[in-house]
UniProtKB/Swiss-Prot annotation:
This is UPF0502 protein Shewmr7_1629. Gene3D superfamilies: Winged helix-like DNA-binding domain superfamily/Winged helix DNA-binding domain. HAMAP family: UPF0502 (MF_01584). Belongs to the UPF0502 family. Transmembrane segments: none annotated. Disulfide bonds: none annotated. It comes from Shewanella sp. (strain MR-7). SUPFAM superfamilies: Winged helix' DNA-binding domain (SSF46785). InterPro entries: DUF480, WH-like_DNA-bd_sf, WH_DNA-bd_sf. Pfam families: DUF480.
């Protein structure tokens, strides 16, 4: 499964609204567009037209990841996901797992602490350990749906990303580059780099002075 940014946003919104506002689910095109363009709980914030959202819906329909529904006496078409936990989906997830995947689709890579804080309307995690346990399960599936990203400089927690809109090869490449010495040096900020360069210069000067003293000592003994 490979989702574009717009497709991932649509699926994330459908997953979210199914849980948080079940009385309004399935969603009309207008309601779904508003959900996609929310200023809060979205990263990045988008400004999609209804036409763009419809394009994403058409594409998802071809992938059999959404379905259309029309109510009796209503001409308004509404949309529901077939992403997981349906008779048509191979992906079966717990409520906790749905919450984590939904948040990652809507807000990009996040730490377990961030996921716990932001998931209160989707699922009640007791603590961060429960989030981490769920993440571990999702990563250890026969076909993993999450991956751990390299820890950012100065950060204590690693972030995790979903693999529906991020290729596993990209994640593996990022992990490999983070383990290499060049990645460590590239991660240094400008201030750290300047301090290191100043320290190297200072050490070089000290070595030069010691060499001069050693040469003088050798000359006096000969």
């Amino acid at each position: 499964m490979e989702l574009t940014l717009h497709e991932a946003r649509v699926i994330g919104c459908l997953l979210e609204k199914e849980v948080t506002t079940p009385e309004q689910y399935p969603l009309s095109l207008n309601a779904l567009t508003l959900a996609c363009n929310q200023k809060t709980s979205r990263d990045p914030v988008l400004d999609l037209s209804e036409a763009k959202v419809q394009d994403a819906l058409d594409s998802l329909n071809k992938k059999r990841l959404i379905s259309e529904q029309s109510g009796f006496g209503s001409r308004v078409v509404k949309y529901k996901h077939r992403f997981c936990n349906t008779e048509f989906s191979e992906l079966q997830l717990s409520n906790a797992a749905v919450a984590i995947v939904c948040l990652l689709l809507l807000r990009g890579p996040q730490t377990p602490g961030e996921l716990r804080t932001r998931s209160n309307r989707l699922h009640d995690f007791k603590d961060v350990l429960e989030v981490e346990a769920c993440i571990k399960q999702l990563m250890e599936r026969d076909k993993p749906v999450l991956a751990q990203l390299p820890r950012e400089p100065g950060k204590r927690e690693c972030r995790y990303t979903e693999l529906f809109s991020q290729g596993a090869e990209q994640i593996n490449a990022a992990s490999l580059s983070a383990d290499s010495p060049s990645a460590d040096s590239n991660s240094l900020n400008a201030q750290d780099r300047q301090q290191l360069e100043a320290r190297v210069t200072q050490l070089e000067e000290q070595v030069a002075k010691l060499k001069d003293k050693l040469d003088s000592l050798i000359a006096s003994l000969s």
